[in-house]
Regions:
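A short, N-terminal "cap"/entry segment at the start of jelly-roll beta-barrel domains
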Residues: 1-47
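Short histidine-centered beta-strand/loop micro-motifs
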Residues: 60-66, 98, 117-119
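Short, conserved beta-strand element in jelly-roll/cupin
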Residues: 66-81
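Short acidic-glycine-tyrosine-enriched beta hairpin
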Residues: 84-115
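Active-site or metal-binding loop neighborhoods of secreted/extracellular toxin and effector enzymes
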Residues: 136-160
């Protein structure tokens, strides 16, 4: 009970100090995740940052990479992480789903692909620590990397 009160006060403080951002799904314009800036809100030169994420919606069906290497720790709840499998020629041949439960810790490069699928009965909270930006991010579609903006614009056009 005391820990719950501390957590509530902490997140209320972050929100009251403009350290909460709701990231919208850019296709359906629905809330995708809540990001709480634990460290720097506007990082430009510092080599890493620390966020708490509360996932509100699953990722799109295609796997994506990230602009930075990152580490993530599941704090509460969990999710299915779909990870692509590749053949010896670098072609995607399938995906496997792994349940990521509280306590799961993972370090990934900026070129690691995955997608998150939520269990509708579980709220996923993670500690997310991105490193320095290495590249733009995008999605893997039919064994081809598609830049984030192009991918989302294509999805938006196909959803209308």
């Amino acid at each position: 009970m005391i820990l719950q009160k501390i957590k509530n006060k902490f997140f209320s403080w972050l929100e009251s100090h403009d350290r909460k951002r709701v990231i919208m799904d850019r296709v359906d314009n629905e809330p995708y995740l809540e990001r709480y800036y634990i460290f720097l809100k506007d990082r430009t030169w510092f080599p890493f940052n620390v966020f708490v994420h509360k996932f509100l919606k699953s990722d799109p069906d295609d796997v994506h990479d990230h602009p930075w290497p990152y580490a993530t720790l599941i704090l509460k709840g969990g999710y299915y992480e779909w990870i692509p499998q590749f053949n010896n020629y670098g072609e995607k041949i399938g995906e496997i789903a792994k349940w990521r439960a509280p306590g799961h810790f993972r370090i990934c490069s900026s070129t690691s692909y995955h997608r998150i699928e939520l269990d509708p009965n579980v709220t996923a909270w993670t500690l997310f620590m991105p490193g320095p930006q290495k590249r733009e991010w995008g999605f893997l579609v039919k064994n081809k990397w598609i830049p984030n903006g192009d991918y989302l614009e294509s999805r938006k056009q196909h959803s209308t």
